[in-house]
Design a protein with these regions (language model features):
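ATP/NTP phosphate-donor binding region
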Residues: 1-64, 76, 105-120, 131-136
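Short glycine/serine/threonine-rich phosphate/pyrophosphate-binding segments
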Residues: 16-17, 72-78, 180-186
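Short, solvent-exposed amphipathic alpha-helical segments in soluble enzyme
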Residues: 21-26, 82-83, 188
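Short, ordered loop/turn segments at secondary-structure junctions
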Residues: 39-41, 71, 93-94
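Gly/Ser-rich helix-loop-strand patches that form or flank binding pockets
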Residues: 81-91
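Catalytic core of DAGKc-family lipid kinases
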Residues: 94-170
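AMP-binding/adenylate-forming core of the ANL superfamily
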Residues: 171-175
Length: 188
């Protein structure tokens, strides 16, 4: 049962205004507190009130995160909650919505089911990138290119920390299953 949910939306408030209103109504009915970062609350002209908490940034101690937008918005939420165990529930307000859980039809019923915990979660694989400056994780893909002015890059790649190959090239794209169609389609 969900008691606290974070909310992240598309950068244009008008795209998700109706959905935010619906989410607030269903959340109040279910006794769920919605948590918004200050800039998100300002974007939607919301203030801390009954059922709404506003903080400088999103807390990680929530039960669920709603991401209302396109895949970019959903990726932002997934990055924020990576490694926390907080599931991200995506509502598609973008062009493709590959990462979205639902489309914006019948939101009240879908939000109510989400608050009741009536959803399955899936874990998405990530790619870990290691550099001397630190490590990063990528949910979709990693693109490595040669330095400007150099003819080719000499790249090594590893699986589970063990080097499995080297390649001399202009660049290399490594994609997870959920993003594997992006690089080829970008060439069309």
């Amino acid at each position: 049962m969900v008691k606290a949910a974070a909310v992240v939306t598309h950068r244009r408030a008008q795209d998700t205004a109706a959905a935010i209103g619906e989410l607030l109504t269903v959340a109040r009915r279910a006794g769920v507190t919605l948590h918004l970062a200050r800039d998100e609350a300002e974007k939607h002209a919301l203030t801390a009130a009954d059922g709404v908490a506003v903080a400088p940034e999103l807390p990680t101690d929530v039960d669920l995160c709603f991401a209302l937008g396109g895949d970019g918005t959903i990726l932002t939420a997934l990055r924020r909650y990576a490694g926390t165990g907080v599931p991200v529930f995506g509502v598609n307000y973008g062009e493709v919505g590959f990462l979205a859980t639902i489309d914006p039809n019948g939101l009240a019923a879908d939000f109510a089911r989400a608050f009741a915990g009536e959803f399955d979660t899936i874990s998405l694989p990530t790619i870990s990138v290691g550099r001397p400056e630190g490590n990063w994780s990528a949910l979709n893909d990693v693109s490595v290119h040669r330095k400007a002015g150099l003819r080719v890059a000499d790249l090594a790649y590893a699986l589970a920390g063990e080097e499995i190959g080297r390649v001399r090239c202009d660049g290399l794209v490594v994609a997870t299953p959920q993003a594997s169609t992006g690089p080829p389609l970008a060439r069309l």
